[in-house]
Amino acid sequence: MVVSMREGEIISLFMKHFERHSLGDDAGFIKLNNSWLLVTSDMLVWKTDVPDFMTPEDAGRKVVTMNVSDIAAMGGRPMAFFFSLAVPGDVSEDILRGIARGINEGSKVYKLKIVSGDTNEADDIIIDGGSLGIGKRLLLRSNAKPGDLVCVTGDLGRPLTALLLWMRGEKIPREIEEKARNPRARVEEGVKLSSLANSAIDISDGLSKELWEIANASNVRIIIEEERLPISDSVKEIVSDPVKVALASGEEFELLFTIPREKVEELDIDFKIIGRVEGGNGVYIKRGRKIEELEVLGWEHLAGGIDVEL
């Protein structure tokens, strides 16, 4: 019997069958003396993850960044990258060379050693990447505390804006396209956060979804303020509802984190305070004087992709 299931439901189904695991965060973890070995994997599928404004080199870099970002969100420093590649039998050599160059470039940016690989045949190009890292103190989604401030690195909205413009066949401004084609994982920020923050997650599926992930995992209530969202100026100039785009934009690879109020001044990174953590449940957004429950927006595999328009 075939049943339509969403990505989160499939993950939950598998976790119910695993008796020993450290799943449920951006990366798995194993204790090694005074440190933690961090392990993650993340897959790129050409049809859904590589719009044609991206090059094969972009795709290769992206699969490295996707995996490194998971290590960064746990407060770790990535050390190695590995991947499996499945391709159709008629794939062009130019595409393969481009992917290889991109993976190499990404590994150099993050100072990674490429340690393993495998190839197979499939109907689409699939790059299943993975990364290993080391962390001293783990940042978990499940450790947000009432009284924490909710913060985010960088700016939001550009990757989704690029995708929406592309879907409409419109020209993508260079500043918008730049982050969609070549995002950077916040490795140094994650390492600095590891000694100060209580919880963290990377923004791969959209700010809204990641806020709900932290709130549910930590059993807390999160309230963010609309006017505090760090929305890119270039996004504000293009889209009709920049707040909705910022909340839904995935593949940002920024870090969303919660931190005790008294430790904020110790942070030497670029970030914005967007809200607070309270006792209770759920995620809410303050719009002027009104507070309402935050809609879950963002990318959803197996459910039609994105649910936002320009």
UniProtKB/Swiss-Prot annotation:
Similarity comment = Belongs to the thiamine-monophosphate kinase family.
InterPro entries on file: PurM-like_C_dom (IPR010918), PurM-like_C_sf (IPR036676), PurM-like_N (IPR016188), PurM-like_N_sf (IPR036921), ThiL-like (IPR006283)
Binding-site residues for Mg(2+) 4, renumbered to this chain? 26, 40, 70
* CDD domains the record matches: ThiL
Residues given in the record as Mg(2+) 1 binding sites: 41-42, 118
Organism, as annotated: Pyrococcus abyssi (strain GE5 / Orsay)
According to the UniProt entry, its GO molecular function terms are:
ATP binding; magnesium ion binding; thiamine-phosphate kinase activity
Which keywords describe this protein according to UniProt? ATP-binding, Kinase, Magnesium, Metal-binding, Nucleotide-binding, Thiamine biosynthesis, Transferase
Catalysed reaction, written as an equation:
thiamine phosphate + ATP = thiamine diphosphate + ADP
One GO BP annotation of this record: thiamine diphosphate biosynthetic process
Protein name, as recorded: Thiamine-monophosphate kinase
Q: What class of enzyme is it?
A: transferase
| Record gene name | thiL
| Residue numbers binding ATP | 117-118, 141, 204
